[in-house]
């Protein structure tokens, strides 16, 4: 169970919230009024996914542009990936593997500069977060990810 508290000047439109949640395969199951200014929503997230995650499930390679935040990659049934940095990048890999419920499976941190990295993907991985240990500026030219 999650609790999210939002303070707004106006009430949130249940229809608009429902439409936004549909974008990530979530559904509002129930709405309860708990006071003049308090509502409780029951939301089914069993088929949800991370919004705007890069998709490596249907592709063999991703060419990722300059990041504004760590990359989130959606994967399934892969055993290895090769991450290569574009010209001008040297980075300190910080990679986190997550299961379908976003529980951490494994964390890989490298305290040395890399241009290329071949890494095994743990079983049951559904998402991978790829970051630089120190600064996203180290991967400002982007990364290429290939599944093997």
Locations of regions flagged by a protein language model:
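Noncatalytic modules at the cell exterior or secretory-pathway interfaces
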Residues: 2-3, 11-28, 36-41, 77-82, ...
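Non-catalytic extracellular/lumenal accessory regions of secreted precursors
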Residues: 28-66
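Non-catalytic, beta-strand-enriched accessory regions in extracellular/secretory proteins
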Residues: 59-76, 116-118
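Non-cytosolic beta-sheet module surface loops
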Residues: 75, 84-88
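Short, surface-exposed beta-strand/strand-loop-strand elements in extracellular ectodomains
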Residues: 89-104
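Solvent-exposed serine/threonine-rich low-complexity stretches and specific carbohydrate-binding patches
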Residues: 106-113
């Amino acid at each position: 169970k999650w609790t999210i508290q939002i303070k707004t000047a106006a009430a949130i439109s249940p229809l608009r919230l429902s439409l936004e949640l549909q974008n990530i395969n979530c559904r509002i199951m129930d709405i309860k009024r708990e006071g003049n200014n308090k509502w409780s929503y029951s939301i089914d997230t069993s088929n949800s996914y991370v919004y705007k995650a890069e998709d490596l499930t249907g592709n063999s390679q991703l060419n990722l542009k300059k990041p504004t935040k760590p990359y989130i990659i959606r994967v399934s049934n892969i055993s290895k990936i090769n991450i290569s940095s574009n010209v001008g990048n040297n980075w300190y890999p910080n990679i986190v593997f997550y299961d379908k419920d976003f529980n951490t499976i494994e964390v890989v941190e490298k305290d040395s500069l890399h241009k290329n990295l071949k890494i095994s993907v743990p079983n049951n991985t559904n998402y991978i977060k790829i970051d630089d240990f120190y600064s996203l500026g180290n991967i400002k030219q982007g990364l290429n990810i290939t599944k093997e």
